[in-house]
Amino acid sequence: PEFFIQRDMEYFDKAFRQAADGKEEVPLSLIGGALKKMMPKFKVRRYGCKTLGKLYERLDRYELVMTEKGVASAVRLKG
């Protein structure tokens, strides 16, 4: 899975930028939609993760934004 993450990192960054549209926090649903447009066969499990949130959590430059119930709802750049 680590190989695939490194190989496709540019897509994860591009999907974040496209979905962000200038916003700091980006809903995971928008990122997922952008990834599906770029990579129609995108499957989060290929990267060893059960959810898109877990995948972005593994990427060093991003952090998850949690809801009050402790559910990951969005992603933002660290720092």
Predicted feature locations:
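N-terminal regulatory modules in eukaryotic regulatory proteins
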Residues: 1-79
